[in-house]
Regions:
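Bacterial Sec-dependent signal peptides at the C-terminal "C-region" and cleavage site
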Residues: 11-25
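Active-site mouth of glycoside hydrolases
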Residues: 28, 32-175
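Positively charged n-region of N-terminal signal peptides that target proteins for export
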Residues: 1-5
Length: 175
């Protein structure tokens, strides 16, 4: 009997592992974003929930925030820093919202381009249905020292990062 129970659990686990997940199809055609082959118009908001008198992001109010976003007609959230919490990503997906995930150039090694750790995030979450596309950069004009003051160095970094992302994840656009 124990062997049969163990076999049943193993069979169930294998079945779950091989059940395909439903991921929305995202593509750019000309100047249009298509989601599941239908035009997708971004009605978005930048979201970085830092409570008053705090300096770090806190998702304690995520349920309320998502409800307010939906009531306002928002369908897309742009985040400045990747969310490394599957439960939060699942809540965003369950709310029917999509994410534009931004990667900074130098974020002290936390999912940034300089350290290359942004690729770890993409590997981990590229199949999550909340992801609409990846975004490289935010306000780089404030940090020319990152590129020795030469804009061509920035263009080269963007080109390399885009190529690496497309190798890992051909299913999401890069902005």
């Amino acid at each position: 009997m124990k062997l049969l129970s163990l076999f049943s659990v193993l069979l169930f686990s294998i079945t779950l592992f091989f059940v395909p997940t439903k991921n929305d199809s995202v593509q750019v055609l000309g100047n249009r974003i298509l989601l599941n082959n239908s035009p997708y118009y971004i009605k978005g908001i930048c979201y970085h929930p830092v409570p008053k008198r705090q300096t770090t992001r806190d998702f304690e109010t995520i349920d309320q925030d998502l409800e307010l976003m939906k009531e306002a007609g928002i369908n897309t959230i742009r985040i400045y820093a990747p969310i490394d919490d599957i439960q939060i990503l699942d809540k965003i997906d369950d709310a029917g919202l999509k994410l534009i995930v931004g990667f900074g150039y130098n974020q002290n090694g936390i999912f940034d381009m300089l350290s290359g750790t942004y690729l770890d995030y993409i590997k981990k979450y590229k199949n999550h249905n909340a992801i609409l596309f990846w975004e490289l950069g935010n306000e780089y004009n404030y940090h020319p020292e990152w590129f020795d003051g030469t804009i061509q160095n920035w263009y080269n970094a963007l080109s390399t990062a885009t190529d690496l992302i497309h190798e890992l994840d051909p299913n999401h656009p890069v902005a």
